[in-house]
């Protein structure tokens, strides 16, 4: 390309044949390409090393940004789980309200209404069939919600063969009465267990005596353990997993509260001998108080060792 005034070339052009065959052009471009490739490889190694150090050591500005990004991801995941839990709770509340309304309607029925099925057996059989289908759907949904609840609380059996605390909930050991003083996070573990039992009662549509966790129970661990135990035994009895009059000392001595909670989540049946009275709060509280006080006395005599 030449200038229209001075007729001097303003841009140097090469044809394709000369570019591909001229030693001067090929050598220069190949050297430049080789140098660029080496620089790209070196920069890629630097970026990879910097990211690995930032992720592993979490030092420097980039490490802090990576750590913050991970925290934001976990926070978003927890927020999604919390939103899902609130939706499930609202759904269960609506089902409970509908159940209570149907129960009140059944109680308000007059004796004359009971004669209607005999007058129209076909309609009665149809209603019975619909009721059976509805009960099956409610039972299936309830079981599904309970399984999701177990996954949300991450209730697992430990693989470390720990004889004292073989189970964990939300990544901390599940406390028990027998080794209460050996666990430094017993209060936090019990709080998670109480929350789980309350949500489980709503998912399984079971009325429990203590439906809320009071703040004063955080200082009175004997009452807190007793409340949790009564609620847990109530669910097991209502779900036909435990007889109505179990012997409380034999039951807790055999399974303890962590074993009973694991059987509730895993679906196993609870074996126990028959007691003289139902597991009331008074009976459970007396056993828990005696067991924990005996543990305190054993600790004072030096028979127990507190693990830091």
UniProtKB/Swiss-Prot annotation:
Keyword list, A-Z: Autophagy, Coiled coil, Membrane, Protein transport, Transport, Vacuole
Superkingdom classification of source: Eukaryota
Record keyword Ligase present: no
Bilayer disposition of the protein: Peripheral membrane protein
GO terms classed as biological process: macroautophagy; protein transport
Coiled coil, from the record: 73-109
A GO cellular component annotation in the UniProt record: vacuolar membrane
Stretches the record annotates as Cysteine repeats: 3-18
Localization terms from the record: Preautophagosomal structure membrane; Vacuole membrane
Family from the record: Belongs to the ATG14 family.
Role, per record: Required for cytoplasm to vacuole transport (Cvt) and autophagy as a part of the autophagy-specific VPS34 PI3-kinase complex I. This complex is essential to recruit the ATG8-phosphatidylinositol conjugate and the ATG12-ATG5 conjugate to the pre-autophagosomal structure. ATG14 mediates the specific binding of the VPS34 PI3-kinase complex I to the preautophagosomal structure (PAS).
Name by which UniProt lists this protein: Autophagy-related protein 14
Lineage of source species: Eukaryota, Fungi, Dikarya, Ascomycota, Saccharomycotina
